[in-house]
């Protein structure tokens, strides 16, 4: 996705979701849609949708709504759907193995092309049709397979070291699944998904709802 537009991170995270639902509407043959209809489908407040869309100028017309094909083309270009993003996976434990098996099958422009694991032999092995190498070969194989960003599913004690190596290689970004709070250069994008924190937040919401 292009970064000429400075938009909030929360809005950025919703863009792929908008694109997915708009694809569904297009497949159903819908020609136009209102923010209310999109809100009901996505379970997102219509005011939030209008505010998100406003960052990109006039995407719709008052009294008409949004042209589905126009939105489809707009979000496809905004999210660079015409370009394939190659991803490296670092850490092939339980979560990493699941990610390899899934390999973003619904996202035709995003693919894990190479993986690294400390238990892999020096000459590599294949898991779910993806080559897996020892981390000693990270710099060499990351470049060889043309990866742009990395997914980290390693142990917390190894996470920062791996992030430092990726930064030295000028990797564009990291999706961090470890609980470690990583430090990366300003030139690198970092997104952390801590499943235990998300679960605790869900438990808190459930418990407080019951009060």
Swiss-Prot record:
<dbReference type="InterPro" id="IPR036291">
    <property type="entry name" value="NAD(P)-bd_dom_sf"/>
</dbReference>
<dbReference type="InterPro" id="IPR022876">
    <property type="entry name" value="Tscrpt_rep_Rex"/>
</dbReference>
<dbReference type="GO" id="GO:0005737">
    <property type="term" value="C:cytoplasm"/>
</dbReference>
<dbReference type="InterPro" id="IPR036390">
    <property type="entry name" value="WH_DNA-bd_sf"/>
</dbReference>
<dbReference type="Pfam" id="PF06971">
    <property type="entry name" value="Put_DNA-bind_N"/>
</dbReference>
<dbReference type="InterPro" id="IPR009718">
    <property type="entry name" value="Rex_DNA-bd_C_dom"/>
</dbReference>
<dbReference type="GO" id="GO:0045892">
    <property type="term" value="P:negative regulation of DNA-templated transcription"/>
</dbReference>
<dbReference type="GO" id="GO:0003700">
    <property type="term" value="F:DNA-binding transcription factor activity"/>
</dbReference>
<comment type="similarity">
    <text>Belongs to the transcriptional regulatory Rex family.</text>
</comment>
<keyword id="KW-0804">Transcription</keyword>
<dbReference type="InterPro" id="IPR036388">
    <property type="entry name" value="WH-like_DNA-bd_sf"/>
</dbReference>
<feature type="DNA-binding region" description="H-T-H motif">
    <location>
        <begin position="17"/>
        <end position="56"/>
    </location>
</feature>
<protein>
    <recommendedName>
        <fullName>Redox-sensing transcriptional repressor Rex</fullName>
    </recommendedName>
</protein>
<comment type="subunit">
    <text>Homodimer.</text>
</comment>
<keyword id="KW-0963">Cytoplasm</keyword>
<dbReference type="GO" id="GO:0051775">
    <property type="term" value="P:response to redox state"/>
</dbReference>
<keyword id="KW-0238">DNA-binding</keyword>
<dbReference type="GO" id="GO:0003677">
    <property type="term" value="F:DNA binding"/>
</dbReference>
<dbReference type="Pfam" id="PF02629">
    <property type="entry name" value="CoA_binding"/>
</dbReference>
<keyword id="KW-0805">Transcription regulation</keyword>
<comment type="function">
    <text>Modulates transcription in response to changes in cellular NADH/NAD(+) redox state.</text>
</comment>
<keyword id="KW-0678">Repressor</keyword>
<dbReference type="InterPro" id="IPR003781">
    <property type="entry name" value="CoA-bd"/>
</dbReference>
<feature type="binding site">
    <location>
        <begin position="91"/>
        <end position="96"/>
    </location>
    <ligand>
        <name>NAD(+)</name>
    </ligand>
</feature>
<keyword id="KW-0520">NAD</keyword>
């Amino acid at each position: 996705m292009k970064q000429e537009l400075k938009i909030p991170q929360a809005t950025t995270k919703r863009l792929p979701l908008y694109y997915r639902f708009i694809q569904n509407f297009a497949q159903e043959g819908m020609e136009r849609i209102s923010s209310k209809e999109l809100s009901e489908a996505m379970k997102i407040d219509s005011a939030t949708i209008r505010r998100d869309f406003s960052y990109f100028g006039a995407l719709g017309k008052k009294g008409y709504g949004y042209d589905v094909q126009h939105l489809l083309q707009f979000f496809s270009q905004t999210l660079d759907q015409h370009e394939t993003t190659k991803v490296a996976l670092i850490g092939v434990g339980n979560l990493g193995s699941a990610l390899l098996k899934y390999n973003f099958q619904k996202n035709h422009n995003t693919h894990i092309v190479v993986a690294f694991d400390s238990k892999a032999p020096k000459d590599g092995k294949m898991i779910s049709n993806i080559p897996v190498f020892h981390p000693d070969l990270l710099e060499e194989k990351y470049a060889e397979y043309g990866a742009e960003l990395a997914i980290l599913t390693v142990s917390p004690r190894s996470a920062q070291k791996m992030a430092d190596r990726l930064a030295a290689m000028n990797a564009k970004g990291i999706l961090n699944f470890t609980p470690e709070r990583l430090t990366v250069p300003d030139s690198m994008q970092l997104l952390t998904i801590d499943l235990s924190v998300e679960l605790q937040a869900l438990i808190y919401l459930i418990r407080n709802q019951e009060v």
